[in-house]
């Protein structure tokens, strides 16, 4: 049974402005593994990746119902499976989780569905 659904839409240019003012912003948002992937990309791809992870983590926080206020960005990790699809590899939710991240132009959108294991 679905117990939560969260959606987030983010402008990549807004993330870029924050990142330009504070390059440590990526360290606040990304886990150690995510940061290693982020650092392997050229600049434009870094922005897209960072915005996607931001949006995915915001969508997760909305799906679980707490918002980021009760979670930290470090509580949630989004990596890719062998096909390149995003997966939630770390979160406080014990059921099944499904995530989709889509990029189009200056926007990134993420959707997270949480499902009870019963």
Curated annotation (Swiss-Prot):
It comes from the Bacteria. It is found in: Cytoplasm. GO terms for cellular component: cytoplasm. It is an enzyme of class 2 (transferase). Its cofactor is Mg(2+). Pfam families: ACPS. It catalyses: apo-[ACP] + CoA = holo-[ACP] + adenosine 3',5'-bisphosphate + H(+). GO terms for molecular function: holo-[acyl-carrier-protein] synthase activity; magnesium ion binding. Keywords: Cytoplasm, Fatty acid biosynthesis, Fatty acid metabolism, Lipid biosynthesis, Lipid metabolism, Magnesium, Metal-binding, Transferase. GO terms for biological process: fatty acid biosynthetic process. Mg(2+) binds at residues 8, 58. Its EC number is 2.7.8.7. The keyword S-adenosyl-L-methionine does not apply. HAMAP family: AcpS. Transfers the 4'-phosphopantetheine moiety from coenzyme A to a Ser of acyl-carrier-protein. Belongs to the P-Pant transferase superfamily. AcpS family. This is Holo-[acyl-carrier-protein] synthase. The gene is acpS.
């Amino acid at each position: 049974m679905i117990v939560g659904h969260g959606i987030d839409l983010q402008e990549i240019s807004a993330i870029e402005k924050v990142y330009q003012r504070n390059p440590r912003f990526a360290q606040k948002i990304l886990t150690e593994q995510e940061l290693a992937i982020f650092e392997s990309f050229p600049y434009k791809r870094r922005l897209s990746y960072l915005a996607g992870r931001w949006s995915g983590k915001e969508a997760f926080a909305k799906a679980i119902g707490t918002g980021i206020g009760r979670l930290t960005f470090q509580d949630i990790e989004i990596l890719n499976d062998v096909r390149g699809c995003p997966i939630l590899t770390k979160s406080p939710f014990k059921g099944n989780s499904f995530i989709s991240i889509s990029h189009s132009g200056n926007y990134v959108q993420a959707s997270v569905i949480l499902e009870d294991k019963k």
